Amino acid sequence: SGWDRQRIVDALIRETEVDVVTAQEISREVEELISSSNISMATSPLIRELVDAKLIERGLEQARKRHTRLGMPLYDVDQLILHPNKENANVPHGPEATNLTLAERIKKEYALLSIFSEEVADAHMRGDIHLHDLGFIDRPYCSGQSLEYIKRFGLSLPNSIAMAKPAKHAEVLLAHMVKFAAALQSHFAGAIGWDAVNLFFAPYLVGMRDEEVKQLAQMMIFEFSQQAVARGGQAIFTDLNLYWEIPRHFEDVPAIGPMGEYTGKTYSHYEHEAQRFAWFLFEVYREGDGSGRPFFFPKPLVHITEKFFRTRGHREFLHHICEVASQKGNTYFVFDRGETAKISECCRLSFKLDASDLEDAQQPWKMRYCALQNVTLNLPRIGYLSGGDNRSLFERVEEFMDMGVRAHLEKKAFIEKLLSYGENGPLALLAMKRDGSSYLRMHRASYLIGMVGLNELVQIQTGKQMSESQEAFKFGLKVIAHMKLLTDRLSESHGMHFVLEQTPAESTAYRFAKLDLEYHWQKAHHVVKGDIPRGEVYYTNSTYLNNGAVMNPIERVRLEGLFHPLIEAGSLTHIWLGEAKPSKESLANFVIKTFKQTQNDQIAFSPEFTTCNRCHRTSRGLTEICGYCGSRDVDGITRITGYFTRISSWNKGKIGELHDRYRNQGFLRVAGKEEKYEGKMVMLISA
């Protein structure tokens, strides 16, 4: 529409609030520069860059920031479209995935320039802390909810072109659940967790034959597994919380059945139907998909409680889910000891229920929880900066945590602003009030403070890793206990629920290690794990012991479990099985021992598989050649953090960790009632 210098003036005044005289001077200088350069076509991006240069010349850095154009270089976009993004192994490669990544890149820049303060943004950029899911700055992290919400209110979503009344049949309830999960996935950055799924389906299963219940179980698992058409081509990161018994807090709760109506009974009357559904879900998991591969999603989390062991059929069910754990690795064992009750999701996150939550259990549709954001601290960085001085170390822990809290306050303010627009705003789904209060209950939100590299921090301070000496291990406990004390103090002072979390750190452990090798090479190269020449570097995740430490698996579970009472937002210990396929009896004994003799919150047994892209068959263990057809066109499958995925999608840091993992080959074999460990034990700590 022709050149008009006034547009530059208007944009500068509107966006940067510089005075009119300065804006006019800059517009004239840019016009002269374009005229003298013989540029045939002055595009908007070019003009904006020239204006930014003039702002920098005048020392107007804040104005330059506000005037910045967000985007990506042409070369980066070209690479992005041609090559897969390995930052998240759950994102496939395709047009929808590149759309997601492009949008994420812009929102990341927006978050760091506009939402977070310069101090917080700088702390993230230099690697003191990590702000997770910056590309999803306009949504909370993850959520836990109840099927009772859609059973009671149907599928009535803001901006939807059709409204569905409460389901009459189990298949329709499942369809509502999947659709609602997809809608929630587009409003949360992380996992979508569902509480007591088998129990809340139970009133719909009365009178159904076993074949019909199994078909429903099959539909559920395949529907969630094949939803790789949702956000960015991703499968919905779904967690199903399952119980063999009726949880105490749901025993006397009136049951909601077809059409959203009360059945006249409490949930304690539906134990048999709930157990049938749980049993058949694990039958489907045991069979695997059409190629015999384990299902990546939805993830089944079985709660093991005191009541579990008093419930009829628990031994058979425990053997059943342990057989699935051995053959396919799907089962997560969540330990709710004493009076504890929680909803678990997202690799290891859990929402522990307090007295007010248990009151909400009388109306389970109110039981909706979210973690608003996850901020992770680079613990080895604290070690490098402290120079071996313990007092300095604990002071820096406090400084880093204060920066994390500041990031949470800034994200909270932004989300509250978006929610203030209600059902006409960008977070309409989370602002909807079907039961009189917003779907996202901000007063119940948690704010996560995670950690990476405790093992390396301890190594820097004591000269030993946590698996190498009792003194080193106890120092690690002291650091986390100090962080727990700080989160409690910060929660009280800010009136917010700050909690420690074991960050999954799929890419963060790699990012921190790379940055520290760049900025603190002299110290970092002694403690960073992996293969430095190949760039396959990482820090030990959260509070874990070294992945490669050779030790009895029950001792690893016991020692790592000593941290778990301090980490309110959830913890997990992996037992890497490799090719081993232990008996269901030995795994069941292991689970019982973990429940009764340790403080561990959650465990998962993780086997490894090779899947062939030619003959589509799957075999145990990681191999370079298909054992069936001899093809080299194969891919490995195992857990990257808290979920299964193809190894070809992993980043370099996770590849380095995979090489180092100590597999418990031979694991445990039952001899009478005793377990015999066949591996080599390096050390046992009495802690």
Name the predicted role of every residue range.
Residues 1-85, 89, 659-663:
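Charged, amphipathic alpha-helical regulatory modules used
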Residues 4, 8, 193, 447-454, ...:
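Catalytic-loop motifs flanking and including active-site residues across diverse enzymes
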Residues 81-443, 464-465, 469-627, 631:
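Conserved catalytic cores of very large enzyme subunits
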Residues 199, 242, 447-460, 481, ...:
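Contiguous, well-ordered alpha-helical segments that form the cores/surfaces of helical PPI scaffolds
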Residues 214, 221, 460, 654, ...:
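Metallocofactor- and cofactor-centric catalytic cores in central/energy metabolism, strongly enriched
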Residues 439, 443-450, 654-655:
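Core of folded catalytic or high-affinity ligand/protein-binding domains
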Residues 610-629, 642-687:
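Intrinsic, low-complexity terminal and presequence regions
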Residues 630-636, 640:
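Short Cys/His-rich micro-motifs in 6-15 aa windows
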